[in-house]
Structures are given as structure tokens and as C-alpha cells.
Amino acid sequence: MPEPSKSAPAPKKGSKKAVTKAQKKDGKKRKRSRKESYSVYVYKVLKQVHPDTGISSKAMGIMNSFVNDIFERIAGEASRLAHYNKRSTITSREIQTAVRLLLPGELAKHAVSEGTKAVTKYTSSK
């Protein structure tokens, strides 16, 4: 049985072929695509609740996934509610109802009160 063929040998030191993939033809480096996340906001909330506590990058990744998941669930439920009521706009009322439907008991009450507080603060600052 023949050996599996290996990829091209690595270029030698000083070789002109050793141009990285991140470089364009004119020598400029390609700009890295920005990865959006909630890490800044998770960190701010953590410092409000536990000022002396840190968070690992793995835990931050988990928190980011959690926030994305909850966002998608609430947005999906709010969209469904708007569709049921033949509305084309998702308002704070749909979001509030979606939160009440998705989150259990006391957690929903706290989320609704915090949301109402945030909306009030936003509208008063305008």
C-alpha cells in the first residue's frame, strides 16, 4: 500500500515563499474580522455584583453562549407573538410577554422589573 502523499515541504529560512496568509500582495496585513460578544457587559455586571471576583475565558465563552441563546429565544417568542396579533413591529410589550412566557416565576418578575426600569431610564434620557 503506498504511503499517503505529504503536503509541500515547508519553505526554508529566508525564502521568499514564506509570506503569511494574513499578508496581501502589496505587503499590508489583512485586517482581522471583529468577533462581537457580550464579554465587556458580562464583566461589568460581574464587577457590580462581586467586585473582587474574576472570570476565566472559558467561563466567559459559556456566558456569551448563554446570553446569545436567551436573546434568540426571547426574540423568537416576541416575533411569534407579533405574528399572532398581526403586528409587524416587536415592541417592549412583546418582549415583556416573551420574558414572562420563557422565564420561570420569580426570575420572570425580576427580569420584567429590570427591563421596565431600563426602558424608563432610556426614555427619560432622550
UniProtKB/Swiss-Prot annotation:
Monoubiquitination at Lys-35 (H2BK34Ub) by the MSL1/MSL2 dimer is required for histone H3 'Lys-4' (H3K4me) and 'Lys-79' (H3K79me) methylation and transcription activation at specific gene loci, such as HOXA9 and MEIS1 loci. Similarly, monoubiquitination at Lys-121 (H2BK120Ub) by the RNF20/40 complex gives a specific tag for epigenetic transcriptional activation and is also prerequisite for histone H3 'Lys-4' and 'Lys-79' methylation. It also functions cooperatively with the FACT dimer to stimulate elongation by RNA polymerase II. It comes from Homo sapiens (Human). This is Histone H2B type 1-N. The modification N6-malonyllysine is found at K117. One of its GO terms (biological process) is nucleosome assembly. It holds the Pfam family Histone. The lineage of its organism: Eukaryota, Metazoa, Chordata, Craniata, Vertebrata. The modification N6-methyllysine is found at K47, K109. The modification N6,N6-dimethyllysine is found at K58. InterPro entries: Histone-fold (IPR009072), Histone_H2A/H2B/H3 (IPR007125), Histone_H2B (IPR000558), HISTONE_H2B_site (IPR055333).
